[in-house]
Amino acid sequence: MEKTMFAYSWHQTDDETKNWSKSKESLRIYGITDDGKTICLIVNDFKPFVHVELPSSINWRQKIGGQPKVQKIMDYLNFILGDLKPVKNRTIFIDKYKLYGSNYVQTSPGVFQRKKFPYLVLFFESRKHIKNLEYKLKNTVDVPGFGKIKLNVRETNVSPILQLCVERNLPSAGWIGFKVEGRGALAGYGELVEEKKKFTDCDEEYVISKNYIYSIDKHVPVKAKVMAWDIEVYSEDGNFPDAMKPGNVVFQISCIFFIVGTSYKQKYLLTLGDPLEYTTTPINEEGCGKDTIVCKFKTEEDLIIAFSSLQKREKPHITTGWNIFNFDTTFLLKRAKLHRCLPNFLLQGFPKDQLGKEKEIKWQSKAYGTTDLKFIDCEGILCIDLMDVVQKEHKLDSYSLNFVAKHFLGSKKDDLKPKEIFICYREGIKKEVKNIVIHPLSNNLNIYLGKEEIMIENKKFKKPLKPFFRIQNTGKLVSDEDDSVFHVNYRGEVFSFLIAVHNEEKYEIKTVSEFNNYKNAYGTYTLSAQKAMAKVGKYCVQDSVLVADIFEHLQTWLSFSEMSRTCTTPIMTIHVHGQQVKFFNQVYKYCYDHKTVTDKETYKVDEKERYRGAEVFDPVPGLKRNVVPLDFASLYPSLIIARNMCYSTFVDNDDIPDEMCHVMEWDDHVACSHDPKVIRKNAITEELEKLKKIANAKKMYTQGTRTYKKMMCSYLVMENTKEKTEMSKHLKDLDRENNELLNIVNKQTPGYIESIKKKISDLTSERSEITKKLSKSVMCVSNRRYRFLKEPKGILPTIIQNLLDARKNTRTEIKNYKSRLALLMEKENKSKEDIDEITSIENLLPILDKRQNSYKISANSMYGATGVRVGALPFMPIAMCTTYMGRKSIVEVSQYLKELGGRVVYGDTDSNYVTFDDVVDKNVKVGTEEFSREMKKLWNHAIEIAKTISKKFDNPITLEFENAIYFKFLILTKKRYMYYTCGKDGNILMDANGKPKMGQRGVILSRRDNCKYMKDVYANVIDKIFDEQSENEILNGVVEKMLNLYTRQIEFTSCEKDENYLKNLIVTKSVGDYGGDKATFEPILGKNEKGEDKWKIGNYVVPLITDEIIKTCGTNGLPMTQNEIKDWYLERLPCQVQLEVKIKRRGHNKEEGQRLSYVVTDIGCKGKQSEKIESVEYFKTHSKVLKLDYGYYIERLIEPLDQVFQAVFKNCQEKETIYSDNFRKTKLFSIFEKRGKHSQANFTKELHKLCSVTKPKLINEIKSFSKPDLVFV
């Protein structure tokens, strides 16, 4: 009988025994059935294997004494390995190809054949045995009969899970089938394990042979069960909670269980205290929610253990949360260790009695920065930190849960600050004691609490005493020195007591601690305590609900499962590791199927090896009309295919002629003496020196710089010269006989010196621009030359082609299914079969969409994986040749476009932006019928141009029209531009507000480290430019916005407390790795991105402190202490890093994610930015003494706006002349300060003076450096 399941989690058991000789590999596969049940397949007959490469100079098949030579190698290996020798009767001798190098040999003139190499494939019981083999063979070995030879062990880093998947062609996440029952377990069929013998808590468990597991083609949504969770913790001192402090308890844990793709949701709140439960549905202001199951516990230890028990009972396949890898999981682990209940806490996952493992993974890459993850590896459960997923896939200003929820869902959670949570906890644990009789020491005194009246010495008091533990509010509670007798001072009388009665049972109370114990045992939580706990409980549950909703909204499960299927990589590996492992697994799978060994050890990366990046054209800044974007489709993957660039096709054999190869040769000259930019810079420097000599010369006559007509050098020339002696000095070196040029100028010639000075200014600016563009890293390599075989097709090109073809086919499937769905939906009377088909298609479309996206990502990542120094399969020649061909291709396209009547306004990497002025009329009015006709004409022309140019390139390199026309396109510099988009019929792409949607790259609008105020001012300027408003209107708008920033301080009593206003001024920046909580601020020698040796703290390069500084720069001139040295290094890190350290030192919590939000304050002097920035929460708390530095925000706008003005307005001069002292903060403050000293009328008068006098001055000043017309070029 056949069964099917969706395999989602794999586990290898190699490390479950410490005895190496008894260690055996076993694999467990966890899957989900159609009806949501969990199955575990236990595979005991799989053996991990490695390849041992033998010297190719020996004929190993040749027999000696009746046995092949290779048998002697096996005998030797068995001898040296002893009990850890390979599995008997499983060793294979085989000839295979190598991944690295073409390895072609000439068999006859002009005929070459790819060479195979001899390998022993050895199977072992455990990977530990493989490590032993690797250790034994790390050096040359002396084999009897062969002498000293080198036996190289290959593919030791391949996991058994990957080996099983490629051997049986199984998806690491996907539907698989397996056979059960039949002829019984001895034949390898799956044998159902009895309940009492089961290793796991899965619904079904089978022991099965790997030979009866196979992949099946099935597209059914998987009903995976997910648990979203969150914790709430307390801090005794109000600072960021330290888990090692006993009082900082975890007092609430929310868990939301849901099934992907269904409406099922079950909410749990595990809590200390007694939260007020629901009164309305689903959540009211005071209760936890009617649909929330509240589980109450007396101690934190019980709470933590219950959290693990809940997982064991509910059996989720996935657990997820927000920032759980960096906070929640770590905090719970530390608390469990503190309470000595760690084993109970780690009892998670599907195995009955096996503990989860604490894991910490840290790695870094250029794409993702530093990744530091701490989680519990629970077998059968995938642990997903959703914040980490969002950080890697989406660029947002902030990664707080609230911000992300607003961005994706449009919803938010209750705004409950950490300190409010701490207050709620303190209130939430308060108890009161009711109906207790207090017996005094004196017999003539009776006090009864909890009744309508009190008898004291036979006197009645209508107002009863409050409960005992509150008696301090009306009387004074004191105790004797021995702390055994209590005295209550009530209305001037002192009463003593020591006995409490509860339920007619007396309890003797002698100390305060005994009373507290009594209160905890028999007291009840106050109503305010219940409300406080409920308030936090609601907040805690909301967090988990938002995580669940974001998980569903982003289709996280489908994304991971489809990427896993494409890359043959387990889901958890994809989540916690980078691109390299996915790349390696794809290559290994192909190599396994084509008898090739991934011998990456044969290639060593030169640490100094570097290569150039993509080609980017210098644009002509300005506002353009009707720009057509033409892009290469998947340029780098296509180049690898077209030029057959691969490890296996790389040619380093001179015997192979160039005719058989794709030859690529070029020079790399970057910032060296051969670089055209450097040559031009040096020429400018020489010319500037000559010009400065002329300008600074004191004599009237001097040698000129320009070539005039030739003239005879004779004394007739000097007849009318006043200063003949000066002339003679210049004539000494002139050769009269050769008629040398006489080039002497009178400096008093009108305008001559002014022209020289202008020339000096222009050349200085040009040299400055060149210097900015020059790379700081010099590269001077002549005659790079690499060759790749034209045939046969390489491994890497084949893999990429397969991925691109698969994506194309999948997208075709999507298109066909959508068409079919549309037809079905149009039917008025739908049959049951139609409804079933509609449901099936709707379920299938998201799967196919995520699948085609996984193909795209995988294909595009192939190139990057080859160009790393430390990686799975590095190979620099592929990366270098790919970027070279990319540079060459975009230059060729620009030339073809010019030949076809186009004008390239900008080019970058794989894109060209071009105008066809002869095809359309650029002056037609937007939105008219004529505009629509012109755009349709341009659209069709662009398609034809793309097809024509594509024919000039090798297959599959294709130039594509982006199906968009940028009818307004403002280009500023390289990688900085903005545009409005329209479609084929001239329909303008609009945003949610009904305005033309602005696309942008590289400018303020697209960079996350600019505040909203700056983006609004900038966008306002660009919108007006695109709307063709006048210069006056544009400049007026800029000045108005800037003045409004200051006048805001007047309009509101305390503008800094205005939430909406303050949000406009918040800056966010990313914080890289500097050591975090374990930071020592001690630099270590490492490598930068270019492979150069640099001193680093985390990811940041820092200078090394000198002995002189250490000796003299301490307090009072004394030598620096260790803390002062650390602070010295801290000051060399970016300001946002310094702010984060400052926040932590204050004991406050850091924001979630790698980005930090702050505002810039005015400290009253010119200080470092690190001294001026403050966290938003800290600023709000201290807004009475802290003020915003408005000047900072304006200064940050000057350069970007000036860049726009120079690009749009004619002859716009330098920015420092546009923005004069009228914008100086001190000048404005001199007016603002009068608000508190004079009447409102005086203030309004001064403000009017500022607006009516200062602003026109500013406008005129800007006008003097620009012409009023907008110029469309």
From Swiss-Prot:
A GO MF label: DNA-directed DNA polymerase activity
Coiled-coil segments: 679-837
Keyword Zinc-finger annotated: no
Record keywords, A-Z: Coiled coil, DNA replication, DNA-binding, DNA-directed DNA polymerase, Nucleotidyltransferase, Transferase, Viral DNA replication
Enzymatic class: transferase
Keyword Transit peptide annotated: no
SUPFAM superfamilies: DNA/RNA polymerases (SSF56672), Ribonuclease H-like (SSF53098)
A Gene Ontology biological process term: DNA replication proofreading
Reaction(s) catalysed (UniProt annotation): DNA(n) + a 2'-deoxyribonucleoside 5'-triphosphate = DNA(n+1) + diphosphate
Pfam families in alphabetical order: DNA_pol_B, DNA_pol_B_exo1
EC number: 2.7.7.7
Function noted in UniProt: DNA-directed DNA polymerase involved in viral DNA replication.
Family: Belongs to the DNA polymerase type-B family.
UniProt-recorded name of the protein: DNA polymerase 037L
Encoding gene per record: DPOL
